[in-house]
Amino acid sequence: MDNNHKGPNDPNSKKPLLQNPLLLIAIFGIIIFVAMRVMNSDEGFGDRFLSTSTKNISYHEMKELIEKKEVDSVSIGQTLIKAISKEGNNKTIYVAKRVPDLSLVPLLDSQKINYSGFSESNFFADILGWLLPVLVILGLWMFMASRMQKNMGGGIFGMGSSKKLINAEKPKVRFNDMAGNEEAKEEVVEIVDFLKYPDRYASLGAKIPKGVLLVGPPGTGKTLLAKAVAGEASVPFFSMGGSSFIEMFVGLGASRVRDLFDIAKKEAPSIIFIDEIDAIGKSRAAGGMISGNDEREQTLNQLLAEMDGFGSENAPVIVLAATNRPEILDPALLRPGRFDRQVLVDKPDFKGRVEILKVHIKPVKLANDVDLQEIAKLTAGLAGADLANIINEAALLAGRNNQKEVKQQHLKEAVERGIAGLEKKSRRISPKEKKIVAYHESGHAVISEMTKGSARVNKVSIIPRGMAALGYTLNTPEENKYLMQKHELIAEIDVLLGGRAAEDVFLQEISTGASNDLERATDIIKGMVSYYGMSDVSGLMVLEKQRNSFLGGGFGSGREFSEKMAEEMDSFIKNLLEERYVHVKQTLSDYKDAIEVMVNELFEKEVITGERVREIISEYEVSHNLQTRLVPLEEHAS
């Protein structure tokens, strides 16, 4: 690359005069000023080139000139009277202040002198009324143009100069700095070998992969993994977001793709990383493009051409891209020869969460009571970024409380903040509402502990959290769930209905607190019918397509079944909800006294642990000589 080249935004490079906004504004201002002065005068353009002089006289002298016929014409304004003399080319303009005089016009008529009226203009009013708005609009236009020029790396006529905005970095991240994605790391380890020893593979006739697509949910470490590959291989790392290629002008995105690959080739071996590639790689068959000249489509076509065009045998350039929406990418982008491999960077399992917590806990001063395995059990389903945030939040909590070490209680509080939201201690609720919340959460807890396939209870609280929750039951599974059996889905429905059922059984009146529970229960049954084939309504037929597994998009937006099928689906959902609701109410009725004890303790302490919930249920069963219905740990969802 030519390091001596100065781009248009180089502070040491001189701008042409006509590109200076202030100079252009001044020029336009002078032109407008001259034009307005000419237009507002009572003389023509021809009179400007004659030799004229102006003389101020009294009104009496003006009348004498008119009476002696020494003026050729008279112009009458609101406050002034102007008269032009008859002295050939050397004319004199006489100006007098007008006074109320009804005899002036008859005098002009009697002397047969031409007269007319003229409007007197105020120069400063003209400036404010005409010149100032024009200059303001012009200034705004020049400001926007200069900003656009900077963003586009040189303006409309300087697309190629965006090269100077593309800088290589040498990441210091290594695979040891990552945890919880061992399978993903194994998939990309050989990419490091390709970059370090390209001749070894070329001598065997092997073709080095041109592209690797990293897919997975948000926050799982896709960007970090790409940097680790470059760090391990010690090669230049060129990173751009997919949206950085798209601009207002068609062709600019394609130009940036060319610039990016040109620079990467000169620095080869190197890595190009495109984050959120779905911004430019959306499928052209999905109806997302406006026309064949759409900016996104041109950018995608250029990317496809570049990945086809560069050779990688001697000087490899490998493209890494990240997305959490692989299902919308263009098939041409995913074919062999472009993105040869897809690597899943998924949420960590229990072991992975422990390792991630260990990585992020290194700079934190810990108390002796910290148990990372317990925290890992409470954080099933969270991504690496969530775990890093929990560690940081725990450190902030300890500092806020003037503690010298981070304790287990700080980590647990940080987990609850991440799952349920910020604790609202200042939110005051009435005793009546507090009672409703206590019964509601107790219902969730009891059904969760007595239903096979549900998650165990870790904590029950009636302290408001987040934007809307007045209480919550924390019952996270110890491990991620990749499959769910039908009885586990039914168990989840029962737990969700436990809150509403408890209100119904103990208070004989229901509230709006169960709205989200009912919505989630309905969605589960809808999925059983339309997607999982777990009902007699549609049998094994899939009625709706799942949208996006990584972003939690739910089920398809378009309905692909008949009105009759829709009616049968609605009937099935309603009947199953009613059936499970009756079952849950009966279970709660059987354990009325246990729930009353739980509610009283919640009123007193506001928080009880999962162990205490199980103790209350066991004590009730022993005192009433009942066979235990508590579900053993191994039969809970884990």
Swiss-Prot record:
Major localization class: membrane
How does the cofactor bind to this protein, according to its record? Answer: Binds 1 zinc ion per subunit.
UniProt KW keywords: ATP-binding, Cell inner membrane, Cell membrane, Hydrolase, Membrane, Metal-binding, Metalloprotease, Nucleotide-binding, Protease, Transmembrane, Transmembrane helix, Zinc
Enzyme nomenclature, EC number:
3.4.24.-
- Matching Pfam families: AAA, AAA_lid_3, FtsH_ext, Peptidase_M41
Q: Which residues lie on this side of the membrane: Cytoplasmic?
A: 1-15, 144-638
> Which leading EC class covers this enzyme?
hydrolase
**What's a single GO CC term here?**
plasma membrane
Known SUPFAM superfamilies for this protein?
FtsH protease domain-like, P-loop containing nucleoside triphosphate hydrolases
Per UniProt, ATP binds at 216-223
Catalytic residues (UniProt)? 441
Which GO molecular function annotations are given, in alphabetical order? ATP binding; ATP hydrolysis activity; ATP-dependent peptidase activity; metalloendopeptidase activity; zinc ion binding
Q: Which family does it belong to?
A: In the central section; belongs to the AAA ATPase family.
For this protein, the record's NCBIfam families field holds: FtsH_fam
Q: What does this protein do?
A: Acts as a processive, ATP-dependent zinc metallopeptidase for both cytoplasmic and membrane proteins. Plays a role in the quality control of integral membrane proteins.
Subunit info here reads: Homohexamer.
What is the protein name stated in its UniProt record?
A: ATP-dependent zinc metalloprotease FtsH
Q: Which organism is it from?
A: Helicobacter felis (strain ATCC 49179 / CCUG 28539 / NCTC 12436 / CS1)
